Each structure stands twice: as structure tokens, then as C-alpha cells.
Amino acid sequence: MPEPTAASYRFFSWLRQGLLAGLSNQAGASPPLTNGHLVLPIRLRVNGAAPVDVNIQRYGPGDITGIDAREVIRTEPQAHMTDFEPNYFPAIEFDRPDFPWLFTPAKADAARRLHPWICLIVVRKEGAALSTVPRQPLPVLTCGQEELPDLDQSWAWAHAQIVSGQTASPNPTLQQILKDHPDRTLSRLLGARRLDPNTAYYACLVPTYDVGRKAGLGEPITADDEQGLKPAWSQGPGAPTGTVSLPVYFHWEFRTGLAGDFESLARRLEPKQLPTTVGLRPMDIGQPGWGMPVLPPDAPGGLLDLGGALRTPETNPRPW
């Protein structure tokens, strides 16, 4: 009977399919933008007629005013959890393995990094407001600028996950898994912040481009906005301070528990110099009984050390 093949988890810093997959394999700069959309040249042939070269435009972040909630397959922690470990990162998972980069209007940079068009932000409920505004397509989060992560690092907090190793093929290709086993693929965003113990948080899925922010808030988008594709917010020296309003595609809330997980307990440990007798219990065999000879009180070998389960590197038991 053949042994079962163990599952193998493969992680990709980004993933694209279809026309965008071909775009990512091309060298050079990103294709031009028209009204904030990627312009891709394709060749069409209809019913055997002569081929026609045309340019197509893909949807961009400025076209998105909502997502299908069924795309979200899991959140960590679950909504309304009250004792989430503060040393863990919140996360959100999507059914499509390419979802975080689906509407990114660019290709990967020279370092093979691709920024997602969405990110997961986690902000403290105290000092933040999540509200529904009439005649606006999405809920609005208002919070302090200091609560938000650095979007220059958003590429590092997104990845795709592929599970392989349980198919008839010993080394299935990525294309095979995407086509034949979509249930083994997903994408994930992590919330880039360190959580505090016993604190309530909002976890919100928001756009990373300013055109996406304006589209979600129902604000007008100018031609300069579409061509510039500025980030939805900025961090670092010279960045604006104060509050920022962001449209929210998906959100939930949770609370962290008290500090008391393994990490916090391990951090409380303090190294101390221990004596060489740690882990030993003296055992007197000078009067064993049962007719065996009795040893004088000071005779060598009359006192032995019985070792325990724990000992230090310096523990030095008496020889038997």
C-alpha cells in the first residue's frame, strides 16, 4: 500500500493570472495608464478574419466601490473575539489567490515586489470612528494618521498560499493547481501592527491608492488623480498629521486578552546563577540493612547523589 503524500505549503509574495500574469513576466517599466487604468495591447481574431490589434483597459482601484463579502473566507481573530493573543497578527483570507493584486495598476518592481491594491489595517477603537454615511457607497473609518501602517511596506504583508503534494502528479505545476484544485489556493493579508493587551480594535480592509479612497468615499476623481496614483495616505517625515477618512470594504472588531501567553511568560524569565547541587538529592547508603555491611559515617561512598529530571550544565553529582 503506497504511503500517503504529505501536503506541501508554498507561499508567493504575489500572484497574478491571465493577462496580468503575462504582464508580470515582461521586463521594463509598467505599461502606460489611461484614466488610471492599465492599457494592454492584444491581438483579436474573430471567425477567421484578419487579426486586429487593439488596446484594452483593465479596471483599476478607482473603479472599485465594494467587494463581494463571499470572497472573504476567514478572519483571524473571529469577529467579536475578546481574548485574542496580543503577540499575534490579525489576518484576512480570500478565496482567490490573486485577489490582493487583482486591481493593482502596475507591475512588480525591479526587486520583484508588487504592492496590493488593498491592505488590512488594525486601529484602536478608542479614538477611531466607523460610521455609515448617507449617499456614500461604503462605511467610513476615521482615525489618527499614526494608527496606520507604512504603505511603502504593504507588499510585505500580503501573500498567496498554495497547497500541493496530494495530487497524482509528483511535482504539479502552479498552473495545474490553479486550474484543477482551486480549493487548495488562497491569498492572505496581515495587519501590520503590534497589538496591546486588553484593548479593543477595528480590523478594516481599505484601499491603498488615493483613487480607491476617493471612489469609496464618493468623491470626484480628477485626471491628475488617475495618472498620479498617489497612496491613500503617507507616513514618515513631512507626511501630513491629524485624522484620515478611509472607505472600508470589509471590517470586524475584536479585543485582545491579558498578557499571559507563552511569549509574555517567557519574557518574564530571569537568568540566575544556580549552585552545582541543583537537580540532586543526597542519599545516605551507610546503613543499607538486610545484613549488608555498615559504613563508618565519614567513609567514602557512604553518601551518593540521586539525579532528578532537571539539572544545570554545572551540576556535578558525586560518583557512585
Identify the role of each PLM range.
Residues R194, S245-P247, L303:
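Active-site-proximal structural scaffolding
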Residues E270-W320:
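Extended alpha-helical scaffolding regions
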Residues D210-L280:
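Extended, polar beta-sheet/loop recognition surfaces of beta-rich domains
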